[in-house]
């Protein structure tokens, strides 16, 4: 029990540290793409900028609207960050802290609960703008979870298990990225929408609006939402690396599994940032059209194909008990 608590605490601290420096990497990346330096004053080449930002936010006085629901107003950001950090307990690096065989189902269940944090924050603010932003965010998140779920089902048919360890064993010789690249492309776009990133950042719309569901938040509670968003970005790209980019270990290269997964997840994270610098924002109707009229029929067709191939060739992948 003590070992598990210690492991969880270390994992949470490492994730929060990674999130802090991801914000600096994003600002640096966007800066160089716009022919400027980015943060370069606090510390060597701006390395301490995330620490300064965090200290500034958490030292601010907590304020909220007079007519807001104070308990739910504070609970919502705490819930968002707790759910985002709890997902990391399921990632095998090379062993996960939580040993369950239905990892993917639990991941989908926990990520679906983040909808309640968004909706609760918008409703508790007692602001019509925050509530409209929350409803818009919830509709977007729920829509793209349908796509993510169908893609996961297609891959589960190939592996024969809901465990992430099964994905590692199945991809010993061939990555799913090569054999199932349409699924990988749709998965990547769906993770962009699920994490509310450009070009699907209709939730916030920073260049047009002040913010979305968190428009009334400032200081510490706002920082918790910020940490939850970037933790989800790191998690989704790590999950993508495990599901589509092969096993954690390597028979040919003598490198640690954690280094291997970082080498595969980092280019995906940089691609997230690159997309923010390059693409304009979708209209909301285009966002929904892409999901319900493009991704959903294609996902259902691929799911039917995978299912029929599995039955035709004598069953799905070998179940990993």
Curated annotation (Swiss-Prot):
Query: What range does the record give for the signal peptide?
Result: none
Keywords in UniProt for this one? Electron transport, Membrane, Mitochondrion, Mitochondrion inner membrane, NAD, Respiratory chain, Translocase, Transmembrane, Transmembrane helix, Transport, Ubiquinone
- Residues passing through the membrane, by range: 2-22, 71-91, 100-120, 148-168, 173-193, 224-244, 255-275, 295-315
Q: Name one GO biological process term.
A: aerobic respiration
Subcellular localization: Mitochondrion inner membrane
Chief localisation class: mitochondrion
**Membrane topology qualifier:** Multi-pass membrane protein
GO terms, molecular function: NADH dehydrogenase (ubiquinone) activity
Q: Which Pfam families match?
A: NADHdh
- Catalysed reaction equations from the record: a ubiquinone + NADH + 5 H(+)(in) = a ubiquinol + NAD(+) + 4 H(+)(out)
Cellular component, GO, one term: mitochondrial inner membrane
Q: Which EC class is the enzyme in?
A: translocase
Record's keyword annotation contains NAD:
yes
EC annotation from Swiss-Prot or TrEMBL: 7.1.1.2
Family per similarity comment? Belongs to the complex I subunit 1 family.
Which purpose does this protein serve, as stated in its record? Core subunit of the mitochondrial membrane respiratory chain NADH dehydrogenase (Complex I) that is believed to belong to the minimal assembly required for catalysis. Complex I functions in the transfer of electrons from NADH to the respiratory chain. The immediate electron acceptor for the enzyme is believed to be ubiquinone.
Protein name per UniProt: NADH-ubiquinone oxidoreductase chain 1
User: Where is the organism placed in the taxonomic lineage, from the top?
Assistant: Eukaryota, Metazoa, Chordata, Craniata, Vertebrata
């Amino acid at each position: 029990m003590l070992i598990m608590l210690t492991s969880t605490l270390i994992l949470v601290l490492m994730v929060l540290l990674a999130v802090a420096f991801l914000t600096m990497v994003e600002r640096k990346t966007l800066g160089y793409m716009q022919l400027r330096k980015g943060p370069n004053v606090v510390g060597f080449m701006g390395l301490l900028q995330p620490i300064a930002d965090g200290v500034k936010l958490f030292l601010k006085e907590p304020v909220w609207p007079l007519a807001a629901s104070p308990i739910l107003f504070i609970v919502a950001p705490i819930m968002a960050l707790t759910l985002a950090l709890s997902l990391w307990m399921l990632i095998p690096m090379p062993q996960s802290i939580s040993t369950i065989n239905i990892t993917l189902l639990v991941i989908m269940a926990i990520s679906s609960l983040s909808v309640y944090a968004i909706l609760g924050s918008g409703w508790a603010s007692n602001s019509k703008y925050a509530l409209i932003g929350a409803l818009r965010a919830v509709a977007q998140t729920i829509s793209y979870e349908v796509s993510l779920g169908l893609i996961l089902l297609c891959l589960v048919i190939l592996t024969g298990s809901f465990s992430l360890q099964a994905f590692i064993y199945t991809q010993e010789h061939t990555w799913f990225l090569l054999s199932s690249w349409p699924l990988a492309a749709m998965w990547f776009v769906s993770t962009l929408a699920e994490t509310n990133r450009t070009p699907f950042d209709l939730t916030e719309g920073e260049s047009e609006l002040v913010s979305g569901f968190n428009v009334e938040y400032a200081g510490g509670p706002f920082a918790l939402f910020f940490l939850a968003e970037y933790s989800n970005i790191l998690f989704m790209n790590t999950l993508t690396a495990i599901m589509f980019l092969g096993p954690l270990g390597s028979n040919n290269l003598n490198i640690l599994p954690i280094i291997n997964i970082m080498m595969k997840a980092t280019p995906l994270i940089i691609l997230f940032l690159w997309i923010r610098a390059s693409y304009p924002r979708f209209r909301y109707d285009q966002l929904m059209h892409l999901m319900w009229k493009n991704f959903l029929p294609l996902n259902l067709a691929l799911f039917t194909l995978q299912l029929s191939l599995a039955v035709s060739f004598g069953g799905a992948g070998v179940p990993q008990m």
